[in-house]
């Protein structure tokens, strides 16, 4: 029997490799479908691109949630539980697979599967970056081609049988969840529970990034979501500062400023991270930028500069002690054999002056303690 006719989908051919059990499941909106998959090229070697079994955990999607690779929902809803089938899908269905694959690989590496940390997600990501970070996926992106998916359907859960994660919510539910998550993150931050606070901010960011992929980049609604996202990312960075994860703060804040160079708080938070890793010049430059953009933050800037001066002085003292210890250890070593040649005449140049302490003229940005209050929930749904 021609399975392509049964699916009634152009550009799809199905071959059942192992029959399933029972009747066809009742796939309804909100059903969770759990499955293993293997993606291959249509070349002679049947080159494997991705394999969920190698990752060590199955994949799952929610029916009706506009999954990135829409054809997978069609394929899965044609299957019985425990069925194994091979699907050949033409290029019209596989063009966005490289973007999905990148998300899956990020997840396998323990990173956020929605890639919020690079401040763009899905198709919107392609407007800001020209590579997916994987050579084979870049090739697929440039030259889309038919792909083969081998899928094993493991389980189908009704909407009432499992607890839905925030990223599985509808568009309207996500928008309602964001201010709640934001406010909870702020509450936890004030209690000093920075790990839990950062998780709440991350959840809110994931919701907004998912919504943002459904908007045209740089148009009004996309920019509104971007502003909300940047606020949450900076709150998340304040948690990272408390957890002493300074280089990740530098990564996130620098990425924000590449796209939105007028965000004062991003300069302030980045300055604090630079100061913690003794990047004196960079910290002072960011604090100076804070003053240029927001002169009213002069008091906070001065405070940060004093802290920077103290930190640099402590570092210089540590270096002097280290050098002194090295010299004292060298003095206890047996004297070296005298050189056979007369030593060269010593230089009469005076020793270099020690660096002066940095001046105290800068420091700003909202203090890290009170995290930004959550924005009011927008009054309209972003469902598409």
Swiss-Prot record:
One of its GO terms (molecular function) is farnesylated protein binding. Highly expressed in retina. Specifically localized to the developing photoreceptor layer and within the photoreceptors of the adult retina. Changing residue 197 to P: No significant effect on interaction with NUB1. PROSITE patterns: TPR_REGION. Residues 328-384 are annotated as: Disordered. GO terms for cellular component: cytoplasm; cytosol; nuclear speck; nucleoplasm; nucleus; photoreceptor inner segment. Transmembrane segments: none annotated. Residues 53-145 form the PPIase FKBP-type domain. One of its GO terms (biological process) is apoptotic process. It is found in: Cytoplasm; Nucleus. Pfam families: PPIase_AIP. TPR repeats lie at residues 178-211, 230-263, 264-297. InterPro entries: AIP/AIPL1/TTC9, PPIase_AIP, PPIase_dom_sf, TPR-like_helical_dom_sf, TPR_rpt. Residues 367-378 have a biased composition (Pro residues). PANTHER family: ARYL HYDROCARBON RECEPTOR INTERACTING PROTEIN RELATED, ARYL-HYDROCARBON-INTERACTING PROTEIN-LIKE 1. Interacts with NUB1. May be important in protein trafficking and/or protein folding and stabilization. This is Aryl-hydrocarbon-interacting protein-like 1. It comes from Homo sapiens (Human). The gene is AIPL1.
